[in-house]
Amino acid sequence: MIKFQANYALEENKIDCLLNKEIKGLHNFEENKIIICTENAKRKTNYRNEKQRPNKDNFKTELAIRKALRHESTHAIQKCNNNKTVGDIKNLEDKLHPSKRRALKFSTSRFSGTYAKEVEAYILEDKAKKVKKMLKKYCL
């Protein structure tokens, strides 16, 4: 477990990941915890170790884990911002890729995230520098 300055813990492959093998990460609001489900990400992206796939990288797996970390970090930022979104959701909504719209539907139907917070998190999971800047601004 890793703790960072905003009194958050970062954990990996907890029971929550086993309970839902579709998720790559989650944010526990009550316990200030971000959980990254690396085993789920590996399975969903056909991860292969070096013996199974020499000279091939696992770019898709690495990307999925980074996106999950940025997505869940966005929820931490929202919590630091009095449980509100940071950006203008109406402007962000139009930028959602169809695959992210499907993921958004899944997230809002299966988890407690509100539509606006999930839209923001899905948009920002592709914007590492912006997430880093907002973490510093709202949480540190």
Spans of model-derived segments:
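Long, contiguous secondary-structure blocks with strong helical propensity
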Residues: 1-9, 54-60, 73
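Predominantly extracellular/secreted Zn2+-dependent metalloproteases
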Residues: 1-39, 105
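Structural recognition of the beta-strand scaffold that forms the well-ordered cores
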Residues: 35-36, 76-78, 123
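Short pre-active-site segment immediately N-terminal to the catalytic Zn-binding motif
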Residues: 40-68
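Solvent-exposed, acidic/flexible segments
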Residues: 58-70, 79, 114-118
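Non-transmembrane alpha-helical segments in soluble domains
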Residues: 66, 70, 74, 122-126
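Catalytic Zn2+-binding segment of zinc metalloproteases
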Residues: 72-89
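Metalloprotease/metallohydrolase-associated module, dominated by Zn2+-dependent proteases
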Residues: 88-140
